[in-house]
Amino acid sequence: MKLSYAICFSVVTLILLISVGMTQQIRYDMPFKTTFNNLSPQAKAEVECLAENIYFESAYEPKQGQIAVAFVTLNRVNSGLFETDICGVVKQKIKNVCQFSWYCEDKPYRISTEKRLTSTPNSLYNDIRDLAVSVYINYERMIDPSNGALFYHADYVNPGWKNMKMTAVVGRHIFYNRTGKGI
């Protein structure tokens, strides 16, 4: 009797562990799929800005880290605290400081070169742009790996932010949200 109880308990525990583990997976190949070429001109422009931000902020991070960076960008769009479109958020300066450091480092002018260098069908930039399309069209149906973050930084810098609550660590990025008012 004790043995069958222990086996039953172990099976239930295993099922619970598996189900908990499965909820932690982040899907980026959501059921609503389209290609970049099928988007409207306005959506293409927004996706390009999102892809550039993912590329320059997290190109060599795990896929979940790239998705988390995309979510911070889209969380800002929907927060009411930043610009109301993706390109505006990516290019926004607050107190003459770029919100995404790559944008102030002349990289926007290099992106066309980056695209040309990576024009093969399986290039890193094209993979990231496909990811950006997927997140763009499925944002409201996806799990946010940043847990609602509006800010992040790489783990090798210390910005000294105050009034920030850490929401997640994904790859080499640490994600935060505000605890008070203002940005």
What residue ranges belong to the model's regions?
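Positively charged n-region of N-terminal signal peptides that target proteins for export
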Residues: 1-5
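Bacterial extracytoplasmic/cell-wall-associated proteins, especially those involved in peptidoglycan
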Residues: 21-183
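Hydrophobic membrane-insertion alpha-helices, especially the h-region
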Residues: 6-21
